[in-house]
Structures are given as C-alpha cells and as structure tokens.
C-alpha cells in the first residue's frame, strides 16, 4: 500500500451521516445530495448538522478527493410499512417525512455479515436479534439478513435509553417536565435549531440523569441504589425489545448478538439480559462470558441452549470503507 505523504494522496473521504432519509445506499456527495441532506437536518439537528460541517471542510481542504456519504439509516430501508408507519394523518406524515427510519445501520450491516460468516450461512439466510449497546443504544430484528424492525424511530431518541437520552417515554412527559419545551434551546446556533424538548430528552436524560455518570462500567460495577436502578432500567428495556423481536421473528432466531461498547465489554450486562430471557431459549456460559474476547465474533452462550448467544466487535469505520470500495463508479472515474 502506498504511503500517504500529502492531502493530495487522499482519493476518497468517507463520511458517516446519521440520517439519510430515503437513501438506501451510500452516495457520492454532489451539490444535490448535500442540499438534500441539509433539508434532513430538521429531522436530526443534533447529528446531521455537525456531519455536514465536516463534509464542507473536506470539500474545501481536499479538493481532489471524492466525498462519499454512508448513512446510519440506510440498512433499515427494508423495514416493512406496517412497522415503519406511524398511526398519524398520512398526508402530514408524507409531507414531513414522518416515519420510522432507524439508525446504527452501519453497525448492523457489519454485524449481519460477520455473524453470517461465523455461523457459516449466507447472510440472506440469517435471522437474529442484534443489540448495539453503547452510550447510544438500539436493538434490531434482522430477518433473512435484512432489517425487519429496530428500536430507534424517526430520530435516534426513540427506543432504548442511553447515556444522556431518555429513550421512549410518554410523549406528553416533556410538556410536564418544563414549561419552555417548545422554545429554541440556548444551544441552538444560526445553523442548528433544536428545541428545549430535544435538548432535555437527548442531552439531559438517560443514565447520567439518574447517576451523574455516563460511564456504564461504573454503574454495572456498583451496588449503590441509584446505580442499581439505572442498571435494572437498562436491562428491563433491552429485554423488552428482545421479547418483542422474538415474537416478530416467530421464534426463528439463529442468535442473540451483543455489540457496541457496553455489549462487547460488560459481561455482567450480558449475563443478566440472557438470564432474564432464558424463557426464550437463551443461556449463558459463564466461563465463555467472563473471558477476554478478542475475535470479531465469539460464542458466549451455552452449548445446551436452543439459540446461540454471540458477541460481535462491530466496526462501523470498516463497514464504511467497504461500502465505498463497492461503489464501482468511484474506481471507474
């Protein structure tokens, strides 16, 4: 491989864009693509705005490079309408692009491919319940190698709680929480407009609001009541999605897969989640679960269990690089 000695040696700049709207695959960033993503910033003001700022910098600093956008929502384009549609006025929903999109798709694409290889099956033959558990957390039901359902929705706020996100709550809660929820947040800028409601539920909630820390390893390793409560809440919500997706997949599940910083590193979290879902046919092997995990995919479940329990060390950057290399037009130019 040739050594990179200057900015002129960089041929492709690959960007992770959280919200891709209706885009179902990675895109070369043209002026039209950029403007379309700007419009989507209203749906993901806390994510797309910053990412587009980086894209703009790369366009200026790397004029000879091709910029490619990889979307965290693109993996979920296969979610069927009865799952992605919200029961609201359809005309308003279509006009404002209001539906479930889902996120962490780059991670789930990597997990699907890696787990299929581990199980020695074609990816389009694999059913699994995958958990991307980190400071941002989500779950995904993967059917025949495609996203069937996922816990995040219109935005990454829906679903599981995170370090500073509330996850799914009664939508009216925020109106009782503060009187100024509809106003612009002080964190808003000329190019980034977020409401107080978005700021409260995205930045001032989650397990940090309960414990004062965003470090889940501290929470998992403590017996303090506030830490135990946060741990139990997270386990409860994760198990709820596992149960829901198990039914949605009609019990045809090849594996339960843990990924993300917490999913990969917290043996206690994995053990407790699997214990709580043992009625579905999952069981942990304590020795496997407690050892250091070094491979991309490793087994932590019991050989006597009905379903496999795996840990996947996901790699979103590698998935982005793979997506870029598979775009033939970049190499034919």
Segments (PLM) and residue ranges:
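Short beta-strand-loop/turn "lid" adjacent to the catalytic site in phosphate-handling enzymes
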Residues: 1-48, 66-68, 74-83
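Glycine-rich phosphate-binding loop of actin/hexokinase-like ATP-binding domains
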Residues: 75-180
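Catalytic phosphate/nucleotide-handling subdomain of diverse soluble enzymes
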Residues: 142-184, 193, 199, 260-293, ...
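Adenine-nucleotide phosphate-binding core of ATP-dependent small-molecule kinases
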Residues: 186-190, 199, 203-250
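Internal helix-turn-beta structural module
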Residues: 228, 232-257, 263-333
